[in-house]
Amino acid sequence: MKLIYGVKDKPKFGQLIIFSLQQLLAIMTATLVVPVIIGNGMSSAAALFGAGVGTIVYLLFTLFRSPVFLGSSFAFIGSMSAAFAGGVSMSLGYLGLIIGAVFAGLVYVVIAIVVKLVGVKWINKLMPPVVIGPTVAVIGLSLASNATGDAVSGGLKNAAGASVCSPLIALICAIVTLLTVIICSTYGKKMAKLIPFVIGIGAGYLCATVFTVIGNLADVDALKVINFGVFSSLLDNGKVALSTFFAVPDFTFLTALGGFKELSPAYIGTLAVAYIPVAFVVFAEHIADHENISAIIEANLLENPGLHRTLLGDGVGSMVGAIFGGCPNTTYGESIGCVAITRNASVYSILGAAIGAIIISFLTPFVAFVNSIPSCVMGGVCMALYGFIAVSGLKMLSGIDLGENRNLFVVSTILVAGIGGLSVSFGKIT
């Protein structure tokens, strides 16, 4: 792929801010939603802070050669729920989040040591292109239902948690967003091609705003796409105050400190069982993601800086991120898709996004704005991002002879099992 900005290229400062914002918008919704799913008072702002810090740790370990952002991992949602379920208090549950993330991170550290000692040839034999290709495709295709579901859902919910706006109106906003991204990426001039998602989200948000304003004026719920109520957090007793614009996130370690006196060997064992098996599953995704980004930037990241460094960056980054936000981190397909579609692989954009995530986590207005972006707008964006991830995986199969039964069965089994959602549960762990 011909890149506009290579990994080590540094855009001008003004452009860098916009490119970093684009990366941030691409990953932010998913990063913020994991704490919401877990509940128990977890802070989305703290998770965003943890993702930013974790990404910087990852960049340091990979010598700033791998342009990908780390965000909250959905794979550990069951593990995180088990941490709270097994804790006798909220403080112990929060401490469990950190200990569990350390267990998961140590899996990566151990594998990294093995890779450093014996090399990566065994990885290539264990996971050749005929395995990696469909695995990458499954990562994108398994997210397809999320994108299409979001595309017909608005941001304003009723008491039952259902979207109040018409699915057709939401779909119009999603299509406006998607078409804007496609037009900018395909026909736009240089700058437009570099920031199609910023422009697309802006166009979709504007469309949703128009519908919502009309809906509010005419009192028609079917047109109310955006939930402007999230901006009420900027008011303190009906007045604007400095404290409503700046707030320190509720970091996980602050609550976790009170859990040490309740810690028991049995609970630690529960955490080990909940987190360690999932870490091995996410390890396969780690390989697939780095094979994918390697193909995009035309540089083998498993050799330079090396798989041991990417694993250490991901593992230690997850540990550090969980200390602040409670969520183990992982390389984000949305970030990789953003790099590929915009052809901007500058690692400085990733660094800028990480720093931006840290700063923004303290700024209530920006967090409120991101929370106000309706699902349909992000659904339009994700249709492009997830689709590109799937296509990237299929492209890896271009040199594979699918006329050979051995290859055909490997690819078909992975695709059907992955897209079909095959899963095995052990207690509360899936």
Give names to the regions the model predicted.
Residues Q15-A174, F362-F366, S372, C376, ...:
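Early transmembrane hairpin of solute transport permeases
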Residues A45-A46, P129-V131, L168-I172, L263-L271, ...:
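Membrane-interfacial loop-to-helix junctions in multi-pass transporters
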Residues N40-S43, S166, L179-F253, V273-A288, ...:
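Flexible hinge motifs at transmembrane-helix junctions and intramembrane kinks/re-entrant loops
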Residues G149-S163, N216-F228, F260, F366-S372, ...:
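Membrane-interface helix termini and inter-helical loops of multi-pass transporters
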Residues K8-F13, I37-V57, A274-V347:
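Membrane-embedded helical hairpins/re-entrant loop segments and their flanking transmembrane helices
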Residues I4, G54-S66, V109-I123, L179-K190, ...:
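C-terminal ends of transmembrane helices
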Residues S81-G87, S185, S335-I350, G356-S361:
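Interfacial segments of multi-pass membrane proteins
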Residues Y187-G202, F253-Y275, A288-L312:
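Hydrophobic, small-residue-rich membrane helices and short re-entrant helix-turn-helix hairpins
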